[in-house]
Amino acid sequence: MKNIVLTGFMGSGKTTIGRLVAEKLNIDLVDTDSEIIKEFKLTIDQIFEIHGEKKFRECEKRVIERVSKLENVVISTGGGVVLDPENVNLLRKNGVIYFLYASPENILKRLKDDNTRPLLKNGDKLSNIIRLMNIRMPFYKNCDFEINTDILSPELAAEKIISIHMAKESKR
C-alpha cells in the first residue's frame, strides 16, 4: 500500500487525523515534526528561536528524504513541507498526499491557546494565518486530494481518507 501523507496548515488536524488513520489501518504513524524534534532534541519553537527557519527546513528535508522511503505508513508532515517541491516529489513517489484544509478562522480557534507556533508569534495571529495560507495555498492545491476539516470531525475525515485511499489502492 502506498503511504498516506497528510499535509496542511498548522491546526488543520494532521496529527490527530493521522493517528486515527494509522489506528484504523493498524499501521505506523510517522510525524515529521516529531522526527525533527528528536534530531535537534529541542521543541519546534526552540529550533526556530536558536537555529532559525532555514536550519529547520534543512532538517525537515533530511527527515522527508528518510521517511519517504518507508512503506505502508501514515506520514504527518509539517505545514510548510509543501514549499519545497523536492519534498513533495519525494513524498509522492511512495505516497498519496492529502491536503487537510481548515479555514483561517477555524485554525485560529484551534490554536488560540497555543503559543508554541513560531510563525504565529509576532503580530496578529489571524493576519499571520491568512498571510501564510495565501503563500502556501497554491502548493497545497497540488496535493492529490483535499479533505475539508472544517466540515468533518477528525473521525469522519479519517474515514474519508481511508475510503479514498483504499479505492485508489484497489485500482493499482
Curated annotation (Swiss-Prot):
It is an enzyme of class 2 (transferase). PROSITE patterns: SHIKIMATE_KINASE. Its EC number is 2.7.1.71. Pathway: Metabolic intermediate biosynthesis; chorismate biosynthesis; chorismate from D-erythrose 4-phosphate and phosphoenolpyruvate: step 5/7. GO terms for molecular function: ATP binding; magnesium ion binding; shikimate kinase activity. It comes from the Bacteria. One of its GO terms (cellular component) is cytosol. Catalyzes the specific phosphorylation of the 3-hydroxyl group of shikimic acid using ATP as a cosubstrate. Binds 1 Mg(2+) ion per subunit. It catalyses: shikimate + ATP = 3-phosphoshikimate + ADP + H(+). InterPro entries: P-loop_NTPase, Shikimate/glucono_kinase, Shikimate_kinase/TSH1, Shikimate_kinase_CS. Belongs to the shikimate kinase family. GO terms for biological process: amino acid biosynthetic process; aromatic amino acid family biosynthetic process; chorismate biosynthetic process. This is Shikimate kinase. Substrate binds at residues 33, 57, 79, 136. The lineage of its organism: Bacteria, Bacillati, Bacillota, Bacillota incertae sedis, Caldicellulosiruptorales. ATP binds at residues 11-16, 117. The keyword Cytoplasm applies. Monomer.
